[in-house]
């Protein structure tokens, strides 16, 4: 086992705070409408230019192991806030730095770290309650656009496109962000349920212009096994042919004789059929087939529930107004499923989302909710260079998370004003002893830090602006973009309540851990082995020229 280097007490805390300051100073430069850019070196290709706090934090590793531990703990604040609320990483870092710096000073002055932590926790609890009281629900598109604009570093085009996407696919709909091919941002909306499987044979194409198979008012057969024997399909095919409607078959696989017969029937015009593979794999495939069954009002033909394909009738099939099948995608539009059944299924999936700990599973479950609840919107980000594209895409993703958070818990006045207004509730608190009361004072000062930093980045005097904001009430604050004072809501400067709350809670959590740290352990630096001595020349080689 490698030897360890151990630091105690004041020495440990000083090094840790030094690391915190290095990371926080780099990150907080990006805060506010006049935040500065940070340039990140890449191992290959051009450097990345960003105003995204979490991107800066992720890049930072310090040479000193003890300083690096401090930096990594604050990085955790940024990424945890990003995971919870999707934004607010820079605010969380600024709050954490302020709490840790003041807390470390108090511990150095001989105060009890545990009492300081209790005081900070008490203050944060009161501030969170006050934030919820100030919060207003987000209902209209304008507020959603404003939140998106602020989160995207005051880019109105991003705020507007997100609001439009939410309007089209609903609050539950999935909105994905992709790199576009043009200079402008574009919005593509897929209505209904789309999955990434196309037709199994090009002979199913009936729309030569779009190279797709379009079915109007079709029946939909859902089967969780392979279909290779055409005899199994005959009862369903006969029923569909009598009804004079087209048929979409979604199965694990359609092959051999069965596929050949379907192609021949389609070409001859006896019955219009399109066969596609079921999406997903394993349990996820079964779940998605069940989703389709609920959406279309059909039944999944599965031997697990005692249904054999040869016994299936037209009553077991789902219906939809339209189905479009391209080479790569299938879209079911306006399924005939019962609304109550769809809502119940959505509720069931939402419960699974709450229970899962895997980010990947959560994302896939959210996609399923969206496909059942309304549709999928794709924002294609446009830019003139690859560097700009990456930076803009990161901002769009941030703004999207922020708007979702705003819809979830409402909004508060932005620009650091909400935390300043929450000071009133915290200022009335008293601790059980002097050290706890000092902990409350530390939290009070830290809650002013985001506004101070926004003002400093805009090139103004933080104390002067802060005092003027404190003299006002309600939504009154400072618009750093144009240097005006006024109603932040009217200016359209809003922050999601969830973002501000998460930033404060996560910052206090890490600050509490750091203040109460008494020892740090890291691997001792390895001493370089002495190099081998140079070898002598071979005998008998004297006088030779090389």
From Swiss-Prot:
GO terms for molecular function: ATP binding; ATP-dependent protein folding chaperone; isomerase activity; unfolded protein binding. ATP binds at residues 30-33, 51, 87-91, 415, 479-481, 495. Keywords: ATP-binding, Chaperone, Cytoplasm, Isomerase, Nucleotide-binding. GO terms for cellular component: cytoplasm. It comes from the Bacteria. Its EC number is 5.6.1.7. Residues 534-546 have a biased composition (Gly residues). It is found in: Cytoplasm. Disulfide bonds: none annotated. It catalyses: ATP + H2O + a folded polypeptide = ADP + phosphate + an unfolded polypeptide. Residues 526-546 are annotated as: Disordered. InterPro entries: Chaperonin_Cpn60_CS (IPR018370), Cpn60/GroEL (IPR001844), Cpn60/GroEL/TCP-1 (IPR002423), GroEL-like_apical_dom_sf (IPR027409), GROEL-like_equatorial_sf (IPR027413), TCP-1-like_intermed_sf (IPR027410). One of its GO terms (biological process) is protein refolding. Forms a cylinder of 14 subunits composed of two heptameric rings stacked back-to-back. Interacts with the co-chaperonin GroES. Together with its co-chaperonin GroES, plays an essential role in assisting protein folding. The GroEL-GroES system forms a nano-cage that allows encapsulation of the non-native substrate proteins and provides a physical environment optimized to promote and accelerate protein folding. Belongs to the chaperonin (HSP60) family. PANTHER family: 60 KDA HEAT SHOCK PROTEIN, MITOCHONDRIAL (PTHR45633). This is Chaperonin GroEL.
């Amino acid at each position: 086992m490698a030897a360890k280097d151990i630091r105690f007490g004041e020495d440990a805390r000083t090094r840790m705070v030094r690391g915190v300051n290095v990371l926080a100073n780099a990150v907080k430069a990006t805060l506010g409408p006049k935040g500065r850019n940070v340039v990140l070196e890449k191992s290959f290709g051009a450097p990345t230019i960003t105003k995204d706090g979490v991107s800066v934090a992720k890049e930072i590793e310090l040479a000193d192991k003890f300083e690096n531990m401090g930096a990594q703990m604050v990085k955790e604040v940024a990424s945890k806030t990003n995971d919870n609320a999707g934004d607010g990483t820079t605010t969380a870092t600024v709050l954490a730095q302020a709490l840790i710096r003041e807390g470390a000073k108090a511990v150095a002055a001989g105060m009890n770290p545990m009492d300081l932590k209790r005081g900070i926790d008490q203050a944060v609890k009161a501030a969170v309650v006050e934030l919820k009281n100030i919060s207003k629900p987000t209902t209209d598109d304008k507020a959603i656009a404003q939140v998106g604009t602020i989160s995207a570093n005051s880019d109105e085009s991003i705020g507007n496109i997100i609001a439009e996407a939410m309007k089209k696919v609903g609050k539950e709909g999935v909105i994905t962000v992709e790199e576009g091919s043009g200079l402008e941002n574009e919005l593509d909306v897929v209505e209904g349920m789309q999955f990434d499987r196309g037709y199994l044979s090009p002979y199913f194409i009936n729309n030569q212009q779009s190279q797709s198979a379009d079915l109007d008012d079709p029946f939909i057969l859902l089967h969780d096994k392979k279909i290779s024997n055409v005899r199994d399909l005959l009862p369903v095919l006969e029923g569909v042919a009598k009804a004079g409607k087209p048929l979409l078959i979604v199965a694990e696989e359609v092959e051999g004789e069965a596929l050949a017969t379907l192609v021949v029937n389609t070409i001859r015009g006896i019955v219009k059929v399109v066969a596609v593979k079921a999406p997903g794999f394993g349990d996820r495939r079964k779940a998605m087939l069940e989703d389709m069954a609920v959406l279309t009002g059909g039944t999944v033909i599965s031997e697990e529930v005692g249904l054999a394909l040869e016994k299936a009738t037209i009553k077991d099939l789902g219906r939809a107004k339209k189905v479009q099948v391209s080479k790569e995608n299938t879209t079911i539009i306006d399924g005939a499923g019962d609304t109550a059944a769809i809502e119940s299924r959505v509720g069931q999936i939402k419960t699974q989302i709450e229970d899962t700990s895997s980010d990947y599973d959560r994302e896939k479950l959210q996609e399923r909710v969206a496909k059942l609840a309304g549709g999928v919107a794709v924002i294609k980000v446009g830019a003139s260079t690859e560097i700009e594209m990456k930076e803009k895409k990161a901002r769009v993703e941030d703004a999207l998370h922020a708007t979702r958070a705003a819809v979830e818990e409402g909004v508060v006045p932005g620009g650091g004003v909400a935390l300043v207004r929450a000071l009133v509730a915290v200022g009335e608190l008293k601790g059980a002893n002097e050290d706890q009361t000092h902990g409350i004072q530390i939290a009070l000062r830290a809650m002013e830090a985001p506004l101070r930093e926004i003002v400093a980045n805009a090139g103004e005097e933080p104390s002067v602006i802060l005092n003027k904001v404190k003299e006002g009430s309600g939504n009154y604050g400072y618009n750093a973009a144009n240097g005006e004072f006024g109603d932040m809501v009217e200016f359209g400067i809003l922050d999601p309540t969830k973002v501000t709350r998460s930033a404060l809670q996560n910052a206090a959590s890490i600050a509490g851990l750091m203040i109460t740290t008494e020892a740090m352990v890291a691997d001792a630096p390895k001493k370089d082995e002495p190099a081998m001595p140079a070898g002598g020349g071979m005998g008998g080689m004297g006088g030779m020229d090389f």
